[in-house]
Amino acid sequence: MSAFAALKNNPFGESIFNNTSNGDNHSRDDVEEDEVVQYIANSSDEDDDDDNDDNDNDQGNEDNNLFPLEISAPVDTSISSTPAPILNSRITQSNYTPNESNLKFSDNHVTITLNPSEYIIISGQCNLKIIKGSIKINQCHCLTSEDNKSYNIIALQSQSLPIISHYTTPEMEEDGVTSVSIIQLENSFSGIENISQIEPAFKNLISGQPNVEEPSLFKNYSFDIVLTETNGGYGLDINSYWINELNLLKSNKDDPTPKIIMIIGNKNTGKSTFCKSLINELLLTNPNRPVSYLEIDPGQSEYSTPCALSLSEIVQAQFGLAALPHKNNNIVKSRVEHYFGFTSAVNAPTRYVEIIEELFNHHQTKFSQRNHLIINTPGWVKGYGKELLNQITKIINPDKLILLSNNLNQEYPDNANILQDLTYQSLSIIPGVYQLSKYSAPQIRTINKLLYFHQTTTTGTFNFNDHLLDSSPLKISYACGNSPNNPGIYSTTIINHNIDNEFSHRDLCSLVEVSIYGIYSIKSNGNTKFDEMSCFRRDDGNSPFYLNPDDFDNLLSNETITSKFIGLIMVHSINPNDHYMNIYAPDIIINRLRKVLSTNSNQTNDYKLIMIRGEGDIPNCEMLYPEFINKKIDYLKSIKKRKAATTSRKLVDLKLPYISFETKSKVGGIWKVRKNIKRRGHHQKG
């Protein structure tokens, strides 16, 4: 039986939502069938997570820096057979029927009355406020009107949607009192609703596939109530196993000793969902005690900058998508980040472990006496990923290790293999929530990059009405042999690329262009002078200084050096004659860069800006500027129709880099093999 077929059953937990149809027959709009994120039995967790480079390679390679000798690969790479996972109950629509008495419309908000056993699924963006009574979110988080708080919800189709249900408190049950719950949903247009103007594939990211036959009642609002099944959307129904574990973890709210809780498991088991649920429960139970959140999954992070690892101090519950820093100042009090550069630890494992150790040490120094620490790990728990997990648990030694699995027996072969050699104080095994995402992992990472580069600090929103190329890039100078004192970028580094004397530095400009870079600000606190360091390569007069990745790591680990990760920039192009780069970045990052440069102009040139790159891929939708593409297509059409000379409109042939407009030949092109078909002459005559 296939893994997908086995996903139709659910033995885990009871729910008030179980009477609803599972809704298994979902098509995937705008997503090819082979892009769907799904669990495949007996497969490596890294094989299908990324496009090309995230493979579960267990063989050592002495000449490859991807597997440094500091971390040894496992000897035994055998993988036990794994049964197909089981699907958690799927809630695809609300059981709430709107009428004149339970639904009131206003210009900027709607008021909804929920009776006992009623629930709604929310899609889109809104501010939630409880007017009367109590509600439960995702059958787990209890909110009451006495809190007098407003909660911002960003519910995208790339994630499970929040479920809001009526709730009767234990005190009311004892008194035999039944009461309605009244909530208010207020508009909250953040700009994400316009993301399809940049990438049409995300046109249903906010509200799902529209129903042509039954137009939505909420078409003029920033949110929607899912009253009928949408194409691929489902609500988050937390099962009883999770609820029991969450209640156990929050029961010691008065314990002054903070706990370190690490969540592990295969990918697509619900690790991020459990982490956010646990954080919300801890904050709702004790609002005055912040929670530290260590994200070490660079491929599926929410609070972190894309391709970065972070430690966040969270002070308020958040339902749905975790907003970006400028939007959640009241949610995240502080954040420390380090640029990793890739979406998988396989590309730079030693650097990965070193960053985790640095972030954990920061928590131990700043927050260990007060905050609980929740750690979200990647889903790579086999082969070399298992070896990395061993290293991480030795560094952290969590008080509680929670394994999300499809079998609750600790002696089950897969569980035993994962837990072998791990370091922890206590263990819980709970069922994973195996849900298929509507969007593939690469698409979700593209969404995160678009959200990052289109954020606007001044308005606290996202600008998806304009492409980045609609505005001129920012010019920033760089230091080189002919201009060593330029105040801008001092050097550049590409992870896993140590260059030697045979490398032609004239090619460095081409290597740097059209990529996303992390940028650090570094300062020497001692007598060390960067201009005197021999580790910076200054071989070419017009190319940027280059710092090998090993030297970069040594520089940041130097006790006399102070470093800070500023954020991401997108390098558009380089002018080697005038020694400057054209870059794009969010305005919050540009302001940080200007602050560093202004500090250098007022004092000596103490601060240096160093760029570092990992995979560095720019989303295609940012490079394929529609206006240029359309002009090129019009020109090619005019040439094809032989009207270029007679057309009244003069067309210009744009020379666009990185884009091919060559059409496939119908003759001699791709062969399509046809099997078991015989031509008339092939039939034997009796």
Swiss-Prot record:
Organism: Candida albicans (strain SC5314 / ATCC MYA-2876)
Organism superkingdom: Eukaryota
Any one Gene Ontology cellular component term annotated for this protein: nucleus
Biased amino acid composition, Acidic residues: 44-61
Gene field: GRC3
Assigned keywords, A-Z: ATP-binding, Kinase, Nucleotide-binding, Nucleus, rRNA processing, Transferase
EC number(s) per entry: 2.7.1.-
Subcellular location: Nucleus, Nucleolus
Main localisation: nucleus
Disulfide cysteine pairs (residue numbers): none
The protein's name in its UniProt record: Polynucleotide 5'-hydroxyl-kinase GRC3
Region named Disordered: 1-67
Function: Polynucleotide 5'-kinase involved in rRNA processing.
